[in-house]
Amino acid sequence: WNSQTSNTLFLSDGDATFLTLDLTLDALALGETWAVQGSFGGAWSTTSADQDSLDDLGRADTSPTWATINASIYGSVYLDPLVDPAWGKGNELYKPLVHEIFGSIRGQYAFDYRLTPMAQYVMGGLYTVRGFPQSVNAGDSAIVGTIEYRLHLPRSFSAAPPSKFPWLDKPFRWLPDSTSGAGPDWDFIVSGFFDGGSIGNSDNFAFEVDTGMLSAGVGLDLTLGTAFSIGVDWGWALNSVPELEVDAGNMQFWLSASFVY
């Protein structure tokens, strides 16, 4: 792979080609009310570019050869069997899964290598620590985690036979399906979350900040079938990082949407 930069301020251009070999192992385990997914991998990269060319890519004294370890684990469990003693014990086909706890931990370890900018881990914002600005900091090694409670409102409704989607002659489960036990074809999730992470640099310069980030917030997510989803997250920082101009209490609002046709 190739990385190129053009710096108009310092009138320099960076251009380097890298070779990367990587291996990743993935695992998935599913239960009736829980799921766990994880990955573990390593990568080795090298380049024949000289140090000046590497520096021109945007970071000084980066390693021409480096190795990293990347890992992640995601898990969710539904609390309904705990909060409802009658869950799954009746004759009804539908077993509501309404109250979900989701958690994840992922990160990267770069040993003592200084990585080229394209290989650094970025943190802050959507999908990492939502109370901080997007990609507010980057580093060589990092770890980030999330714990989140999700309330799936449509799954709490009483079961009924399927109806139809407006303007379309197609069955659509607005309510849980009493004939098959399937859940609704749509979901509206109210969530509360806590994100935390730490990011660091190898042999860092004074201006490279090793950062810890903590944030909390709430979110709303709407999905219709498998074709459309939209979500909003409102997060606020729980700690200050003066070097990044972030104060405790600063807020971020995130909107994401997808449509598959």
Segments (PLM) and residue ranges:
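C-terminal outer-membrane beta-barrel translocator/porin domains of Gram-negative envelope proteins
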Residues: 2-185, 196, 200-202
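Outer-membrane beta-barrel translocator/channel fold
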Residues: 4-8, 235-251
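Hydrophobic, well-ordered secondary-structure elements that form the walls
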Residues: 73, 147, 195, 220, ...
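Short Gly/Pro-enriched loop/turn and capping motifs at secondary-structure junctions
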Residues: 154, 196-201, 223-227, 237-241
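Short glycine-rich, acidic/polar surface loops and turns
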Residues: 175-179, 205, 215-221
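Conserved active-site loop/cleft motifs that coordinate metal ions or position small ligands
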Residues: 191-193, 228-235
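C-terminal structured "cap/appendage" subdomains that terminate the fold
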Residues: 199, 209-232
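Outer-membrane beta-barrel "beta-signal"
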Residues: 222, 249-261
